[in-house]
Amino acid sequence: MKFDKPAGENPIDQLKVVGRPHDRIDGPLKTTGTARYAYEWHEEAPNAAYGYIVGSAIAKGRLTALDTDAAQKAPGVLAVITASNAGALGKGDKNTARLLGGPTIEHYHQAIALVVAETFEQARAAASLVQAHYRRNKGAYSLADEKQAVNQPPEDTPDKNVGDFDGAFTSAAVKIDATYTTPDQSHMAMEPHASMAVWDGNKLTLWTSNQMIDWCRTDLAKTLKVPVENVRIISPYIGGGFGGKLFLRSDALLAALAARAVKRPVKVMLPRPSIPNNTTHRPATLQHLRIGADQSGKITAISHESWSGNLPGGTPETAVQQSELLYAGANRHTGLRLATLDLPEGNAMRAPGEAPGLMALEIAIDELAEKAGIDPVEFRILNDTQVDPADPTRCFSRRQLIECLRTGADKFGWKQRNATPGQVRDGEWLVGHGVAAGFRNNLLEKSGARVHLEQNGTVTVETDMTDIGTGSYTILAQTAAEMLGVPLEQVAVHLGDSSFPVSAGSGGQWGANTSTSGVYAACMKLREMIASAVGFDPEQSQFADGKITNGTRSATLHEATAGGRLTAEESIEFGTLSKEYQQSTFAGHFVEVGVHSATGEVRVRRMLAVCAAGRILNPKTARSQVIGAMTMGMGAALMEELAVDDRLGYFVNHDMAGYEVPVHADIPKQEVIFLDDTDPISSPMKAKGVGELGLCGVSAAIANAVYNATGIRVRDYPITLDKLLDKLPDVV
């Protein structure tokens, strides 16, 4: 199905099932511990051996010798896999560094060997016996140190210029010129990376924890140099990903290599301390913002430049993209700079680009509003735009940022905010309020599904879509139930298997909208088959209560399947609407914080997000996504930071003891409001995505609230005690 014109009225608009707050249908399995994750398919792969990864102890250089003799002789050891005995390997298109290193070492904890043994404990013990010898090369590990050497944009991401920024900024009546930094961050998903591989002749089955089944399958086949049709990926349940499981990782490749070598199933799991350095992370940024406005507060010039680092062949953190679209202004400049760093691979993490970019932009907007003497909510409203500032002929499909901000201000009680910093106290606590706009583009990906109508009236949905804790099972079931007129309880959903039609996968906030659109397309085809089976015109037929009705005639779905199960497979492809219209999602984030006047401790007291993100397919699962994202934004604002050893080139705090993330007690009150934002230009579902929007802008809202509470403007995240203590107002 080609979606190339705005959606008219369609079966989803009935909203009998879609748009309602249903519980997650996979919830009972997860809460009872019976949902099986990648490491838990014991019956399907009996007699599994275990692999333990040996990671490089240097960040850059060469492996001069690798002595595995002692490990191979250790109790229970079956094999030691290295680059020298693994056979010729390719490299996946989406991997920056090789997943099995040697002799060249590209980053710290790059896998250089896998010890395979009868038990996990034996493999771990034997791994400690592997002796690696290196020649260390000088590496670059500090973005600040490398910044000056990078003054040109990457070849494939040139600077964007509109109008005359330099002239407009010079003549601006009010201006801000400041630099902001965000640190390296880790995904820290609850489930570690884990895989289990089984070979049957030349056919590989891999159970793994991966967000994008087709990407994983394609890159694994390419790396192993086997036909892609010989690889099957299974990943029905994933314990969080946040972008860290978008791509093929070392656990999957090494499990496959080991299983082939020892001719039996092999399990490989990355221990928590290995994950930050062995896999990927959100790269640090250094962002320079210059914004100018006229006397009335209207922005006349905006420039956003961002520096980030990555391994050779890597890509920059696209932290400027929201600045191209969020506010009006005739004169604009954005640019990305990429330094070569020898830290572990930088790659996607929840809301790549916009999340760190808004951490800077939305502080700068507050600073400019203060200089202009305008309330920060009103300043954002004043500078709203309904068109792409770089192309005024290109409108937004839907844009309700003003409504998000006004609704949020009213609900939050913004009028009671004291605009003068440091004036509101609650005992020993300084109290402040902050706001930020949220923005995330609406990305669209082709997505397919297969839908069966069984003779007993039940419906089965099959797609390689994944559920990373987001509610995919539920919204796909809701879609099929709505389309075919059956109760939600009569729909079974099977996900995460490469033998199913290729879906959009879980990432980029596109999963819900595009995967349900794929199911919509398959159901439309199935509706035609059902109508044909009973002799009805499909375009004039309605589906409800297990029946198909055409005028005064009706038939049961059971009658339609008298000849056997009906099956339809279809995919949704998106045309040029995304080029004709700018498609984005918006939010208004409001935060109240308390800052202890003696210790500098920051406590988030309450948070509110008002979101405009297309049709909300399931308010309950969507709210869960947003409050989780808000929590992640709080972590980014106040605590999350991968500490870099800039002598040896690795992340020091590489576990959950050293890398702090928020817990329930850190945020006592969160509220989410969804505006009616049905968008027929987005998809036949008229939805968008919300899981990343809930993060975008939160950290800046907290930073702005801290400023309102204390008068201290922190531009370097996270906002830790040391950045507040010596500047706090005197204790009264």
UniProtKB/Swiss-Prot annotation:
Functional summary from the UniProt entry: Oxidizes aldehydes to the corresponding carboxylic acids with a preference for aromatic aldehydes. It might play a role in the detoxification of aldehydes to avoid cell damage.
UniProt xrefs under InterPro entries: Ald_Oxase/Xan_DH_a/b, Ald_Oxase/Xan_DH_a/b_sf, Ald_Oxase/xanthine_DH-like, AldOxase/xan_DH_MoCoBD1, AldOxase/xan_DH_MoCoBD2, AldOxase/xan_DH_Mopterin-bd_sf, PaoC-like
NCBIfam families linked to this entry: peri_hyde_PaoC
UniProt GO cellular component terms: outer membrane-bounded periplasmic space; oxidoreductase complex; periplasmic space
Cell wall biogenesis/degradation keyword on record: no
Catalytic activity: an aldehyde + A + H2O = a carboxylate + AH2 + H(+)
Lineage of the organism: Bacteria, Pseudomonadati, Pseudomonadota, Gammaproteobacteria, Enterobacterales
Protein name from the UniProt record: Aldehyde oxidoreductase molybdenum-binding subunit PaoC
Keywords: Metal-binding, Molybdenum, Oxidoreductase, Periplasm
Major localization class: periplasm
Residues engaged in binding Mo-molybdopterin cytosine dinucleotide: 241-242, 468-470, 511-512, 615-621, 625, 688-691
Enzyme class, UniProt record, top EC level: oxidoreductase
Consequences of knocking out this gene: Mutation results in complete impairment of cell growth in the presence of cinnamaldehyde.
Entry GO MF terms: carboxylate reductase activity; iron ion binding; molybdenum ion binding; oxidoreductase activity; oxidoreductase activity, acting on the aldehyde or oxo group of donors
Source domain of life: Bacteria
Outcome after substituting residue 692 to Q: Loss of activity
EC numbers on record: 1.2.99.6
UniProt pH dependence: Stable up to a pH of 4.
GO BP field: catabolic process; cellular detoxification of aldehyde; DNA damage response
Quaternary organization: Heterotrimer composed of PaoA, PaoB and PaoC.
Coiled coil regions, renumbered to chain: none
A Pfam family assignment: Ald_Xan_dh_C
Record's keyword annotation contains Metal-binding: yes
Activity regulation summary: The complex requires PaoD for activity.
Swiss-Prot/TrEMBL cofactor(s): Mo-molybdopterin cytosine dinucleotide
